Amino acid sequence: MNIILANPRGFCAGVDRAISIVELALEIHGAPIYVRHEVVHNRFVVDGLKAKGAIFVEELDEVPDGAIVIFSAHGVSQAVRHEAKRRELKVFDATCPLVTKVHMQVARASKKGTKAILIGHEGHPEVVGTMGQYDNEKGGIFLVEDVEDIAKLGLKEDEDLTFMTQTTLSIDDTIDVIEALKQKYPAIQGPRKNDICYATTNRQQAVRELAKLAQLVLVVGSKNSSNSNRLAELASRMGTPSQLIDGPQDIDPNWLQGVTTIGITAGASAPEVLVQSVVEHLKTLGVTKVEELEGCEENTVFEVPRELRITEVN
């Protein structure tokens, strides 16, 4: 058997930044540091930060007065920000800048009273935070997950409308939804390019190439990672069996029966160390060759907050 590694794969700039913020806050201020929601959706990463003194909570009422709290890469609603300010919590914001960009689109629509339609997955923390940027009762924000949801909106075709998208969606599915929105609401406005981030786009394109060459695709990523799930779905959609795994412990040897080429990729929140542990485990199961696809180079870097950056330099 041989392995083909997707390229690019694994950590994106937003995830790198979010993890650095937690690690630097712990280094500078000491434990405990509270983090609202998993800073990124990866069990290995979260467990590592817990071991260093990070405490993960779902709501701010779990954070003691005067404590330091970090907002996860997925972003938070305005209500959460107001609550943190009211309680005088020290906040470091690890929201991905590309998510913040979508937040600003929603905030502008809210200020104008323009009704907004968000394409995304209900209940995902990024979606909850993004919808929470809208606070104008004269308008409203509405969520659609697929083309079928559009018929349920009940909005007038000539209304002043705008749309935006979650950053970690399936590119193909999102294009279909946007086209359906434009057909039903010809005057709807939106970004010139959808809001799906560069890392999601690049990793999905890499999986397309991988699925053409492999008989099985393994996606390293946690079950609650949106972008990791989309990678597994895309490989399957292209006709190549796929499995989403947290690490080598999840691999079932039965998956490998009759397989000569295994494709491996990783979601944007999965570290390379997990990919390499999967590779090493597969070598014990008969893999003799490992190669990597050519892919686009990613050089995007997002800086950490100034207070942490200054200390980091010193």
UniProtKB/Swiss-Prot annotation:
Pfam families: LYTB. The keyword Oxidoreductase applies. Its EC number is 1.17.7.4. Keywords: 4Fe-4S, Iron, Iron-sulfur, Isoprene biosynthesis, Metal-binding, Oxidoreductase. GO terms for molecular function: 4 iron, 4 sulfur cluster binding; 4-hydroxy-3-methylbut-2-enyl diphosphate reductase activity; metal ion binding. Dimethylallyl diphosphate binds at H41, H74, H124, S225, S226, N227, S269. Transmembrane segments: none annotated. The active site is at E126 (proton donor). This is 4-hydroxy-3-methylbut-2-enyl diphosphate reductase.
